[in-house]
From Swiss-Prot:
The keyword Methyltransferase applies. This is Cobalamin biosynthesis protein CobIJ. Residues 244-508 are annotated as: Precorrin-3 methylase. Gene3D superfamilies: Cobalt-precorrin-4 Transmethylase, Domain 1 (3.40.1010.10), Methyltransferase, Cobalt-precorrin-4 Transmethylase, Domain 2 (3.30.950.10). InterPro entries: 4pyrrol_Mease, 4pyrrol_Methylase_sf, 4pyrrole_Mease_sub1, 4pyrrole_Mease_sub2, Cbl_synth_CobJ/CibH_dom, CobI/CbiL, CobI/CbiL/CobIJ_dom, Precorrin_MeTrfase. GO terms for biological process: cobalamin biosynthetic process; methylation. The lineage of its organism: Bacteria, Bacillati, Actinomycetota, Actinomycetes, Mycobacteriales. Transmembrane segments: none annotated. Residues 1-243 are annotated as: Precorrin-2 C20-methyltransferase. It catalyses: precorrin-2 + S-adenosyl-L-methionine = precorrin-3A + S-adenosyl-L-homocysteine + H(+); precorrin-3B + S-adenosyl-L-methionine = precorrin-4 + S-adenosyl-L-homocysteine + 3 H(+). Pathway: Cofactor biosynthesis; adenosylcobalamin biosynthesis; cob(II)yrinate a,c-diamide from precorrin-2 (aerobic route): step 1/10; Cofactor biosynthesis; adenosylcobalamin biosynthesis; cob(II)yrinate a,c-diamide from precorrin-2 (aerobic route): step 3/10. Residues 489-508 are annotated as: Disordered. It comes from Mycobacterium tuberculosis (strain ATCC 25618 / H37Rv).
Amino acid sequence: MSARGTLWGVGLGPGDPELVTVKAARVIGEADVVAYHSAPHGHSIARGIAEPYLRPGQLEEHLVYPVTTEATNHPGGYAGALEDFYADATERIATHLDAGRNVALLAEGDPLFYSSYMHLHTRLTRRFNAVIVPGVTSVSAASAAVATPLVAGDQVLSVLPGTLPVGELTRRLADADAAVVVKLGRSYHNVREALSASGLLGDAFYVERASTAGQRVLPAADVDETSVPYFSLAMLPGGRRRALLTGTVAVVGLGPGDSDWMTPQSRRELAAATDLIGYRGYLDRVEVRDGQRRHPSDNTDEPARARLACSLADQGRAVAVVSSGDPGVFAMATAVLEEAEQWPGVRVRVIPAMTAAQAVASRVGAPLGHDYAVISLSDRLKPWDVIAARLTAAAAADLVLAIYNPASVTRTWQVGAMRELLLAHRDPGIPVVIGRNVSGPVSGPNEDVRVVKLADLNPAEIDMRCLLIVGSSQTRWYSVDSQDRVFTPRRYPEAGRATATKSSRHSD
């Protein structure tokens, strides 16, 4: 019995026969059998590319797809028709390999990059040895045709199939530094819609049949979507956003701390900025990028940071002002917008993020599940009597309270005063969630989250790194496997009905 043959997955490159690699040309010429695909019309693009390298007397296997985009009467539908085709093609190739013949199975582009070859590779490599000969991809050929740098430095290239749903494609394009969308054809309408929805249609190129005599390069917005072939792609080069965003200030929320809680939009804004402004500790959480200028400061002079941001933007810079948590919650958005009133030529955008209250609440369950108020205990920017009046009103309204800035090195008495105000309206057993250094999906080494009764809240244990959540009369607290769970039901007792249900957990 002769030795089995070897399956060669041969990448032909994007279409120009001169872009076939030296190794691919040799393997094609030496193979006993050359196999290639085609649509039902019978014309094989792969064979046309490889023809200069074929030799007389070679066996050929023409694998004709039964269906591509047209309808089928196969009982299993489109998927069933293709499954039968792949099963038949697998056995045809296997017959040659079993007979000891080496088979070169051709693939446009690269064999393992959105290729027809892969469907047979996964089936045949269970039984036979396979060797891959890589090829120049359509992405490289299209980039050469556009003659514009595609990605540079630490930019990330996203390669996306045009068959994705419009919403998903829009999201991924908006998040990308640079992108290439393949598998166009009938999907181009959706691709164009996604490019438009993400504000990127004017930056994108359309490349058709790259590297061949039929190559065309057009602005993506100018393409007649009724005549787009499958062998085409849309290209969105990197480095375009910085020019578009000059003269702007983006106030960017970093989230509570861990980079896993930073949104893609925030990452995108930070990457596009020419200048980063913020408290030094917050800037340290932002990845360093070549060419960006950083303007760190301490954590007190917000007006000065806002003035610097507007001044730089007025000079044509793309400025990002960073805030921990959400920039609109006791953070920099207010200061920047207030300053921007004096700079009519400066555009300000606020980029939202996860808040500290949301982060702490997630650790114990859903204490913010019903109406709640957010109050800062800091009296640096407003007098204590205003804070006390708001605490009293919120307590009387039976709202859950999220308490920001509860204490600092120089401000230590407000937590105790708050506790006494609330005890005039709340049951002493109401749960208070104390969250310290909650900063990511996984608890960090410095994180501490506890639940105590309102009457047991100890001001000496609270500092600036803490956020407090004080329950309402309906908030419930229980333990599972020594873990505190706290939630506030969405429903509320009807007016006039007794509300004696206590939120404290049962006494031991």
